[in-house]
Amino acid sequence: IRDVLGSRGLGDVYKRQAATGTLPIDRTVVTPGQTADGRVQVRVALGDGEVLTLPLDKYLWRVVAAEMPASFEPEALKAQTVAARTYTLSKMERTVEAHPDADVCTDITCCQAYIDPADAAANWGENAQTYTDKIAAAVADTDGMAALFQGQPIQAVFFSSAAGRTVDAVEVWGNAVPYLTSVDSPEGDEVPNYHSTVTVPLDEFKSKLLAQYPQADLSGEPAGWFANLVPNSAGGVETVDIGGTTVGGGSLRTLFGLRSTSFTVSASADGVTFSVTGYGHGVGMSQYGANALAKEGKSYDEILKWYYTGIDVAPYTPQR
């Protein structure tokens, strides 16, 4: 559920699920004495087409290791674990056209990121054992817990870093989701590449924009192309008029590879420059915000309730 332009999120996945409906998956694997996660088996479609069956706790370790820096605070890692578990349990109650023989896959444009423990250890170097144990503790300490709205698993979308507030889901994907509303997000001081700049040469800007919006009038001075910027709930760009045509901030982000829709824009003969803050689609939980809240002393369930409005954090067993 990561954002393929930068951080992680659900975008098209959420819309596909909303449009297609779901079917229950019949599965029964119970071993007395196991943890709640250990009793649940997850079928994972790997990139080579193999379907691997793992206990939920082993799968979650691989997801969290891929999705969040292991150097983060323990409570932030726990919040990420619950978000990952919630997403997985929700997927287990559905069939997905992209991988009908598996509950989830390892394609981040469809499901969650995934890394093999050996690869994670290689990435972590001398910290491998510490980080391995740290993520295992995050999984064990939240065993069986999920983020629920009206008793059902939520779409626990997340992203890397916000520009001070998260974005309401309806502004990004067109679906009003009661627990995915705009909230304040303290990001802390250590966010990498929090501010970024993208300058697009005029010819490239014209070519890409007119391919999508042929009615736009890009004659005259470039500084005069832009007008009527409408902010979204996070203070970023909901829409802006370019050459007399209304263009969504998300469309500009996709067209020009911007890290978020929180940007300002300037134009001259040298090109169009976007000054961007944050990273990701902006909906749901900010990972760096979660880490900042953990540093303030908030627990994982407090972090989840901060970002997902009106939810409960409680045990959940998938409906098979």
How should each PLM-predicted stretch be described?
Residues 50-54, 71-82, 199-200, 280-284, ...:
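Soluble non-cytosolic domains of exported or imported proteins
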Residues 65-69, 82-94, 210-214, 294-298, ...:
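Sec-exported extracytoplasmic/periplasmic mature domains
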Residues 1-14:
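Single conserved hydrophobic/aromatic residue that forms the stacking wall/gate
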Residues 248-320:
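C-terminal soluble interaction/assembly domains
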Residues 55-73, 184-192:
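Acidic/histidine-rich, surface-exposed loop or edge segments in extracytoplasmic proteins
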Residues 40-59:
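Acidic, low-complexity proline/glycine-rich segments
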Residues 18-44:
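N-terminal, intrinsically disordered, polar/charged segments of Gram-positive cell-envelope systems
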Residues 86, 90-272, 277-278:
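Extended substrate/cofactor- or partner-recognition/assembly subdomains adjacent to catalytic sites
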